[in-house]
Amino acid sequence: MALGAAPAAQLALLALLGTLLPGPGGAGISIHPSKAIIPRGDSLTVNCSNSCDQKSTFGLETVLIKEEVGRGDNWKVFQLRDVQEDIELFCYSNCHKEQTIASMNLTVYWFPEHVELAPLPLWQPVGEELNLSCLVSGGAPRAHLSVVLLRGEEELGRQPVGKGEPAKVMFTVQSRREDHGTNFSCRWELDLRSQGLELFQNTSAPRKLQTYVLPSIDPHLEVPPIVEVGSRWPVNCTLDGLFPASDAKVYLVLGDQKLESNITYDGDSVLAKAWMEENEEGTHSLKCSVTLGEVSRRTQENVTVYSFPLPTLTLSPPEVSEWTTVTVECVTRDGAVVKLNGTSAVPPGPRAQLKLNASASDHRSNFSCSAALEIAGQVVHKHQTLELHVLYGPRLDQRDCPGNWTWQEGSEQTLKCEAQGNPIPKLNCSRKGDGASLPIGDLRPVRREVAGTYLCRATSARGRVTREVVLNVLHGQNILDIVIPVVAVTLILGALGTAGYVYNYQRKIQKYELQKARKAQEEAALKLNAQSTPP
């Protein structure tokens, strides 16, 4: 790695290298580093170490600007500044009237100042060879400098950069159709990885290559094979590979009628867009013609125009009371078949029917009918959907209006109570006793004043239902009412436990003392009997 301006740590390292060289008895000079590569204009620190066993003169010999930045008895450190070109450096020593030298090669690298791809021909025939020139000005060392020819991001070739200013590097490629509009460029690469550095590179401004081709294929016509009477359908006609595409003329004709087209150009492609509308059933011919110069390419497609109205879907009646029989029927044109959701497998035909006993769960249910007609080998589908409305009375259940709420005072809560029914019932919840309203639907802090039992009434034209809702609010006082008895019971149980423990302990002590006294009496009696027995 190239050495720059020497910091204190680097100077210390160079000084250490000097102390490690052979001591008295030998004569010689060494240089460190033994080789280096640095950017042009950069600085380098060099150490000259002398192993002479007597006082001698030594130093660094160079034409470069140098500055001594450190020294010892047998070493000196020099700083070279503003190095512009490759050079060989010498450390010398005059010892015992003999001069010894040590040398190193200092390599300077710098980037090319300019790289350019020479101008391309205005038009390039497809299939012919194309000569491209990359011009490189400056850059060193040339032994590590090369040029790469790029097609977009693809690498086509690589060659070393020779001498000369600017250096000219030639490449030959065969132009292709897909090269039209492609950017070509030159990239120089200065590869100093073998020197402990990295790969440096830069790319020239791209030049776009224009290739000339007249295709022998017919235009591509995009049109639906079947269209409905009275509808408007997009038609696209494209042809790739034209140049210059802007000179191409495109015509779209339906039967004998020329369609108004919107023509756009993109590179070597031309695209014509038009809207097709036909009110007469039958098979019609659509033609696309692309003309460039005196040569034309034509294509033709047949379009079948059909009539297929939506199926007729009826609910009889569309709005019913709960538990009323509803008839669902779907009808389409002859030749088509219908499918009504909810019906079991029935023979396909133009008519389908379903009967059901409507319940509240059927309210707002969708009934769908699908009709299918085969036209020119393709199946066309039409769909119709209706919604059933079921009238039923108010309902208040646990899911939509829970009967019991217990919340902590001050917490943010939303009380939900919703009545079901069609028509939508009017809901009123008032507290027993004072008639206060239940705060439904809003997120708000819970206050103890809202606690109580509420009676919720849902009313509509189809009846009325009621439901009782209890709202409990936990607050400081009722928590104490719970905690104090619990603590009291705990203390009483603790006292009883302690008393029982003391009582049992005292009983065990008394029993132990009694057993001890009894044993002493028995031992005394045995001793007395032994003394009274004659020998």
Curated annotation (Swiss-Prot):
Q: Name one GO cellular component term.
A: plasma membrane
| Pfam families the record matches | ICAM1_3_5_D2, ICAM_N
Domain named Ig-like C2-type is located at 41-102, 127-193, 230-295, 323-376, 410-463
Bilayer-crossing regions: 481-503
Q: Which cysteines are joined by disulfide bonds?
A: C48-C91, C52-C95, C134-C186, C237-C288, C330-C369, C401-C417, C417-C456, C429-C456
Extracellular side stretches: 28-480
UniProt topology in membrane: Single-pass type I membrane protein
Localization terms from the record:
Membrane
Residues linked to a glycan: N47, N105, N131, N183, N202, N236, N262, N302, N341, N357, N366, N404, N428
Superkingdom per UniProt:
Eukaryota
GO molecular function terms noted in the UniProt entry: integrin binding
Give me the Cytoplasmic side stretches, as residue ranges.
504-535
Protein's UniProt keywords contain Transmembrane helix: yes
Q: Which residues form the signal peptide?
A: 1-27
The record's comment on protein family reads: Belongs to the immunoglobulin superfamily. ICAM family.
Q: What does this protein do?
A: ICAM proteins are ligands for the leukocyte adhesion protein LFA-1 (integrin alpha-L/beta-2). During leukocyte trans-endothelial migration, ICAM1 engagement promotes the assembly of endothelial apical cups through ARHGEF26/SGEF and RHOG activation.
**Quaternary structure?**
Homodimer. Interacts with MUC1 and promotes cell aggregation in epithelial cells. Interacts with ARHGEF26/SGEF. Interacts (on T cell side) with CD81, CD247 and CD9 at immunological synapses between antigen-presenting cells and T cells.
Q: What is this protein's record name?
A: Intercellular adhesion molecule 1
Q: Which organism is it from?
A: Bos taurus (Bovine)
